[in-house]
């Protein structure tokens, strides 16, 4: 089993510029940086996880293409959260007016903004506690709606800003609720 590697030796010693250089020089590797300065090296997902992630991204992208309410990002996109962590959700979405407030320079880097919506897809390489902690961090940083999807268990944890986490089993679809009107994500290809 390939696992995510946390490199604690760099805690509080890597600058934003160094992190950006590291990512640019290692485009085939996905990195995140915790708010404590811990560098996380993430292994690529397997083909099935990649397919599932692509399906989720495609459904969000298609809905957004029709509604034009925001901007959709895939898992290669990094954001600098308000707590200074640099995170890359599997799928994310930002309300257009919030994205438009950022400068071109900010948009070209790890944009200093928490997405309004995130999806994390639990892959065999992930530690559940790490991904749940990341979802809690997203909430604390202002993410309004988040889905943690466990394909093997046909389970979804829904994280809503200011509310308790809701756990749902055997769903056929998920709703974007008030945040993303008329969004319905079909989970049958994921489960």
Predicted regions and their residues:
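Gly/Pro/Ser/Thr-rich low-complexity, intrinsically disordered segments predominantly at protein N-termini
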Residues: 1-191
């Amino acid at each position: 089993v390939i696992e995510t590697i946390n490199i604690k030796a760099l805690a509080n010693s890597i600058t934003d510029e160094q992190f950006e250089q590291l990512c640019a020089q290692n485009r085939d590797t996905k990195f995140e940086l915790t708010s404590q300065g811990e560098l996380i090296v993430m292994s690529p997902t397997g083909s099935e996880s990649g397919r599932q992630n692509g399906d989720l991204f495609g459904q969000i992208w298609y809905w957004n293409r029709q509604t034009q309410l925001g901007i959709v990002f895939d898992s290669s996109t990094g954001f600098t959260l308000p707590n200074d962590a640099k995170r890359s959700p599997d799928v994310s979405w930002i309300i257009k007016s919030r994205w438009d407030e950022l400068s071109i320079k900010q948009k070209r880097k790890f944009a200093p903004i928490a997405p309004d919506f995130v999806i994390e897809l639990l892959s065999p390489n992930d530690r559940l506690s790490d991904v749940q902690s990341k979802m809690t961090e997203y909430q604390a940083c202002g993410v309004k709606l988040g889905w943690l999807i466990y394909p093997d268990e046909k389970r979804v944890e829904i994280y809503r800003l200011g509310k308790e986490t809701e756990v749902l089993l055997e769903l056929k679809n998920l709703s974007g609720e008030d945040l993303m009107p008329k969004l319905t994500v079909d989970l049958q290809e994921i489960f």
